[in-house]
Structures are given as structure tokens and as C-alpha cells.
């Protein structure tokens, strides 16, 4: 068997690690590890259900809008999640209903300017996605994988929040 890597985790350069921790806690992340001075850490790792993120203190100012990074998260109740963020002082736009995510989506920026798309993932969309994956496998568009339909039932957030 060929060696492989696993557990892909974005590492974001940030201007203030503590500020990023506070913001990502509002998104449901838990602080897992911290390096450096606890008052002004140089690195942190946070986990949420189904994902992780790390922060590295930037040595000089940078423009995150020039980085080609877009993150996506899923919420089982996007309107309630939006209200939670608003109640905690986060500037959150209205929910939109684009064709690729008809049950709702919003985009916001974290304190360093990184874009975070948050999508409502409904039962109907999840079932349609599972059916689409199965059909692509039958049509030979996707290879058979080690992930069965049952294993994919829990992706991305089914019954975990």
C-alpha cells in the first residue's frame, strides 16, 4: 500500500491569535493547543465537529484577500446560527439562496479577512447529494471508494451538532 497523508488542516496566518480564537469559538470551534506566551500566543489549533484550523502569528502585515483560500462550513440551522453570530457582535450579511445551495448560504470574513462560507445543509440536500454520488459511481464518473453510502450518511454534519 502506498503511503498517504491524512487529516488536512488549514493553517492561517493571522495578526492576533487570541482574536482569531475568540472569533472561531463563536463558529463552534474548541481550542485544542496553544504555543508561546498564553497572553500573545504564536500558534493555536482548534477543532470543530468534522474539521480543524490552525493559526500562526504573522510576522508582518499581509493581505488575506490576495490569498486563494475559501473555507466552507455547514450549519443544521443557518438562521439560528446567524442570530447567534449577530448577538455576539459579528457583522453577518443576510442569508442568500443561490442555486448551488437553495436552502441558504452566507459569506462572512474572519477578523483577518479570510472568507468563510456557511451553508445550511438540509435533509433534502443531503439525500440528493448521496443519490448523486451513487449515480456517478454507477455511471463510472466516480470510482468506487472505501466510503459506503452508510459512511457518507454522516457527512458533513449529520446528527453531530
At which residue positions do the language-model features occur?
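Residue-level structural signal for beta-strand termini and adjacent loop
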Residues: 37, 58-59, 119-121
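Vicinal oxygen chelate
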Residues: 6-16, 44-47, 62-161, ...
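A sequence-level detector of short linear motifs
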Residues: 54-55, 117
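Short, flexible, solvent-exposed loop/turn segments with mixed acidic/basic and small polar residues
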Residues: 1, 59-62
